[in-house]
Amino acid sequence: MTALGIALGGGLGALARYHVEGLIAPRQRSPFPMSTLVVNVTGSLALGLLVGLATAGHVPMSWQAWAGTGFLGAFTTFSTFTYETVRLIEDGSWRWVWWNLGLSGPLSFAAAALGWWWARGLG
């Protein structure tokens, strides 16, 4: 049953990421991968919130499987972040490479920590 939940959550997470990219990409003027940054930061915030709530006993641990591993695992994307960074390097867009590297990791980590802290405060 857990595997089915992860699969369903993953499908929904991938569709959500596709939708977010469809909203952001047409409005973008620079080569900076803004949609990937948005999904990674918001997904990290949501995962921090989920883990904080689950470890405090406010949501069932089973939610971590379908929502955390499934939905948020598919919604966020380290592989796309890596691919887009390499593509920026190949294009010689060094300014955007450094912005991408400098923002993605720290903002995602901070968002996860904020989500966890926020969830712990709810308990």
Regions found by a protein language model. Give the residues of each.
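Membrane-interface helix-loop junctions in multi-pass transporters/channels
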Residues: 1-123
